[in-house]
Amino acid sequence: QVFYTRRAQAITWVPSYDPETDDPPCLQRIWCRVITEDNKNYLRMNTHWRSRDAYRAAYMNLFGLTELQKYIADEISQRTGKEILVGPYIDITDSYHIYGSNFADFKDRFLKMMDTRDFYNQDRLKSRTMRSDDPAVIAGFEYGRQLLENEEKS
């Protein structure tokens, strides 16, 4: 007997209902498994998406699901008495797109930035990317966490 399973998954698709609806779920499946490497236990999480708005939704989707991964790892740790660390997060999307109504904004802001900024520069105003320990990133994650908490309350 082991304290983990290979069967831990959540499926959002309802075959008898979703093919006929105008708004079927974009997130189709979440699969989790505890893996052991170098005598440490990690929670691996894979998600499979039917469709994803790359410009307006993907960031919060990734934030929310990696927060869920942390929560699940903590719950398993508490229930088993074994330390479970957050492991790899693998995100698979079949249709990753930008809606036409957002393309002008995407072109004017995002693509323009690609031509005018370095991939990484310590000066944030000259950089396309930031480190995850940057105060602005930490503040952004905290803001996202608050949005999720407020959404849960409503």
Predicted regions and their residues:
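Active-site helix-to-loop segments that bind/position phosphate- or nucleotide-bearing substrates
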Residues: 1-65, 70-154
